[in-house]
Amino acid sequence: MKIPYTKPSITKIEQDFVENAISVGWGDRCYEYLTRFEQDFARHLQIKHVVATSSCTGALHLGLAALGIGVGDEVILADTNWVATVSPIIHLGAQPVLVDIDPETWCIDPIKVEEAITNRTKAIIATHLYGNVAKMDELIEIGLRHNVAVVEDAAEAIGSKLNNQHAGTMGSFGTFSFHGSKTITTGEGGAFVTNDDSLAELVRTLNNHGRSATESRQFWPERAGFKYRMSNVQAAIGCAQLTRIDELVGRKQEILNEYRNGLAENQYLTMNQDSPFTTSGAWMPNVVISKCRNKGFDELTDVFKKAGVDARPFFAPLSNFPFVSKEPKLQNINSFDLWKRSINLPSFHDITKDEMSTVINLLHSEIK
């Protein structure tokens, strides 16, 4: 593709950090960059605990396991989600309960959450989709009233805030992704974050093959655990990226605004919108085509390919997949509607104005 969908921003800073990690990061120094990354990211988020993991999926799996979620439990999440959000629920033997999204935020609808709660509900997962921020105040109030944990999937929300508080830091715990497509990257990677001391300690134990930090005997686990730890070399990339985080988030926001400005005059196209009191980290610009145009990603696929533009579809509702749901939940009207009419636009950090103009002009020519 001439204009790729996404790619990371890697400079000599990252290269130097990695070279150092490879040179000296062994033996009793094997976790130096990992420890530094956790501390630096905690400082950035203004949160007490960060546990760096091999993926956001792993971080979510650890967190849900630490909450004690298992067979017979229900976890409420939005039908519009990437599969990584639902997979840990299934692996733990719990039942995912899929509800509709808010048409303005594209995130889980608190009204639908309230309607879906039963005596088996153990958690609500709020995914901050594409950098948009969920209605956390309402969700946390619901969680408190029903004694249900509210979890934040902030995989796509680095730089996103509500009332100047970072997405991922408001619920019982949050998770982040540092995949190569994300705003900051470690190649592959994720993080579990929380202000809950006990939960953080349990997650660290689970993430170390069930071995507690307080156990004096070597190779002596106290429970069956996991191994989702991020490598020191990956963490070195992350440490370098964190020195540039304001630059990287700011560039993503510039790109979203460039698309917004370029498409503003087209009455049939709308973009990601910031809700009141929120700041979007702008991970992924999405254009939504008016219903009256009867077009979406499927209808424009060949046009994009011919122009060398690597655009992508909006996330399909999870209830489409038989391993998640017995049948599509068509009552989740907004999830199914936006899926058909929305398109992810190229937004890598080094995209040029000319490349964005190519995408903008293509949309204007096809949607009119």
For the regions a language model picked out, list residue spans one by one.
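PLP-dependent aminotransferase-like
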Residues: 65-154, 161
